[in-house]
């Protein structure tokens, strides 16, 4: 399966998921949309096709075949010399024999991949200055989270809102100015970040980033990248409210409003506690 076929099929899945999302955003569990984005991302990244009679390519005749499944016989008039077929135009190639469009695609992949990598490494370098958060109430809340993976809790003066990063050894980073370690607001914040870790959202963000880099030329993939990141926050909100009680929904909404992420300090692979797309949340 070619890259363009993967991009076309993935784009069709993205359109279907986006339409369903627009119609049922507040009626279906938010995990439903993330499952659909995961299917679309798999189609974009896995070059394997499962034969199906409902496939678009199964409905169309194979290239070079007539509708009957074979080439029509040539009609040659008596005494006329057969006309040789016109040679097909070769694809544009560079001096090394690599098609020009392949080089353009590779350049785009390297450019976007480099952008995301540099952004992530810059954030990691800034986060290294963070200090451990040793407050006893915070440690108790972290221990009550029930996670098997070790989770580090740190404070930094480089961020304005809490965030989470890392997959195998995740880190919850709190702003240095955020106080109230034993308050209700801190309970919401830690539960929010722990929910991101439980759902392996950092790993899914990595998959979405890979799909965006490989299919950088497809605007539908960038739309999926934005909507899927937004749906991760919506699913997280849904899980936090369900876990801590629907009757405290108003307190959680006020916490969302009070938190505004410092966009310049956030990387593409971090999960931040922010009020982005607040009209869709809570």
Spans of features found by a protein language model:
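Short helix/loop segments within enzyme catalytic domains
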Residues: 48, 131-135, 145-147, 198-199, ...
């Amino acid at each position: 399966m070619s890259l363009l076929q993967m991009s076309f099929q993935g784009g069709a899945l993205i359109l279907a998921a986006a339409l369903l999302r627009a119609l049922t955003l507040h009626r279906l569990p938010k995990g439903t949309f993330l499952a659909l984005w995961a299917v679309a991302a798999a189609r974009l990244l896995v070059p394997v096709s499962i034969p199906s009679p409902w496939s678009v390519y199964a409905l169309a005749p194979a290239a070079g075949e007539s509708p009957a499944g074979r080439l029509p016989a040539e009609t040659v008039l008596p005494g006329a010399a057969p006309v040789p077929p016109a040679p097909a135009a070769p694809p544009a190639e560079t001096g090394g024999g690599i098609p020009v469009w392949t080089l353009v695609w590779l350049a785009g992949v390297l450019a976007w991949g480099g952008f995301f990598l540099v952004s992530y490494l810059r954030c990691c370098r800034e986060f290294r200055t963070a200090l451990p958060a040793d407050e006893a109430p915070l440690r108790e809340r972290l221990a009550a989270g029930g996670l098997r993976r070790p989770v580090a809790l740190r404070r930094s003066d480089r961020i304005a809102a809490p965030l989470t990063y890392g997959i195998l050894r995740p880190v919850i980073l709190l702003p240095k100015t955020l106080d109230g370690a034993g308050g209700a607001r801190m309970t919401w914040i830690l539960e929010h970040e722990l929910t991101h870790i439980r759902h392996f959202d950092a790993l899914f963000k990595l998959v979405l980033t890979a799909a965006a880099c490989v299919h950088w030329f497809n605007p539908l993939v960038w739309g999926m990248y934005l909507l899927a990141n937004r749906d991760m926050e919506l699913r997280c909100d849904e899980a936090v409210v369900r876990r801590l009680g629907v009757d405290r929904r108003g307190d959680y909404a006020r916490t969302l409003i009070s938190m505004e992420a410092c966009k310049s300090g956030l990387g593409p692979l971090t999960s931040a506690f922010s009020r982005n797309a607040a009209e869709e949340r809570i």
